[in-house]
Amino acid sequence: YDTNGTIYPGLIDMHNHLHYNTAPLWEMSPHSSSQTNEYGGYENRYQWKNHPNYSPHVTKPKNFVHSGAYWNMESQAMKYVEVKEIVGGTTSAQGGPSSGKDSFDSILVRNIEYYNFGADQIHTKVTELESDYIGNHIKTGNQSGNLRAWFLHLAEGMDESSRAEFDILVENNLLVGELNLIHGTALTKTEFDKLGEVGGNLVWSPLSNLLLYGTTTDVAAAKDAGVRISIAPDWSPSGSKSPLHELKVADLWDDEILGDIFNDYEMVKMVTSNPAKAMKWDQYVGTIEVGKAADLVVLDNINTNPYRNMINAIDTDVRLTVIGGIPIYGDQDLMSAMKGDDWEDAGLGKALDVTFIGVEDGGQSWEDIVGDLEMAMRFD
């Protein structure tokens, strides 16, 4: 069957907080002049959580939907936010909740921290890296060769206290090649050179950085240091919808601010093969090769350059998203050719299949999921 499009490896989201992604973009500005940096944003990530609107606009909407004390709709909410990724061609995503429910963690997108490809040696640390943090599981995993990736929020801000978190990493012997350093907005050439020396990785979320801090990571210095870079959206309160959307922000920043230091091929690698290599998944996904998992996205041909084609593509240009050989979303003609009538109408000529018989809540339809969440999000 001719897809009438271009086939790519599925996009990989290397940094998110998926359980917050039923919330809309958070409209705010620094609430204290003493916490405002020269770019008009916050000095560090520990300040904006104290904004008076953070709880009612970000935390409470998430808790009301997910928590068992309220609507207890974690299954519906997680399926919804994973579909937001899938319609943009994402096939794997980092940052799912730690509840570990089969109703969502083993279906739809690959949840990176869970068991995948015969192993689960991937660790995440979101909280502050304190000076007494030992991290023996990281050290032993690195020494044994079993560690696949360590996702670490670090140096998120613009002040010296943010930059100094990197010093703790070095002093505590935690600067390892499996590190996926998330944000790093405070880092300079000095730190990126050290990260590059060990073969470390950077996860860049330009939109969230710009909205929260007024500027973003020095990816030019990271590139010069040989650091492998991935692009990811962070979360919906201050980030974009998916890597496909974040790719456009990164491309605009590269063109307008950096002087086009990344070519189109390099940009596309940041959402496909770079993430796969950064967590030792490259023998399974990230490129299209015989024997690899069939995590694929088909995009309409809107540009003759296949790499620019992805950068310019929007959700409606996604003709098909396949995860592990299973078609999940796409144009109705392709979904019908591959699945018969086993799908739901998703509007705009698209089809979606979120049902997985054999897992908890696997019979929930897309119509039911949306209806439940619309009711819950009224906050009556």
Locate predicted features.
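Histidine-centered catalytic micro-motifs
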Residues: 10-23, 149-157
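Active-site microenvironment of metallo-dependent hydrolases
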Residues: 16-40, 44-127, 139-143, 269-380
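Active-site metal-binding motif and surrounding structural segment of the metallo-beta-lactamase
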Residues: 1-8
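His/Asp/Glu-enriched, well-ordered alpha-helical/loop segment
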Residues: 172-178, 215-303, 312-327
